[in-house]
Amino acid sequence: MYNVSHDGSNKKILWQEMLRHEFESALEHKPIVIIPDGSVEQHGPHCPMDVDISAPFHMAAEVARRVDDFPVIVAPPVWSGFTHYNMGFAGTISLQLETFQALIADICRSIHANGFERIIAVNGHGGNAAPCRAVSWK
């Protein structure tokens, strides 16, 4: 999933691949951090379990790759979501609502504590929309 095509520019866009001095340099240019969030759940016989996180991750990576006006950094994806209604199906992994919201809030607080002020969550799972919105109001 983390295999992101490179265009030869050697532009690092993935949080987990960056070095400390690269973060410090990026902060000077008021970067945006994108947090892909989704879920691992059943999607019937036609889709893999990771479709809800794979799509926002690759979308975020493509945006980060294409934007040159300022740094865009893709945070590690939040692959565990709120999908309790699919727990009757094999392959589904769900967090409790409070756990999911606390996870998103803690990740945002941690990113902000690193000096990043512009944070965008890109959601790929419908069940996460309202919980993410509630966290954004805090």
Feature names for model-found ranges:
Residues D52-A64:
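Short catalytic helix/loop segments, enriched in acidic residues and glycine
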Residues R65-P71:
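Short helix-capping segments at alpha-helix termini
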Residues M1-G44:
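Active-site and ligand/interface coordination hotspots across diverse enzymes
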Residues I35-H43, P76-V78, F82-Y85:
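Short, conserved active-site loops that position catalytic residues or coordinate cofactors/metal ions
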Residues P31-V33, P71-I73, I120:
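Structural motif
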Residues K12-M18, S80-K138:
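Active-site histidine-anchored catalytic micro-motif
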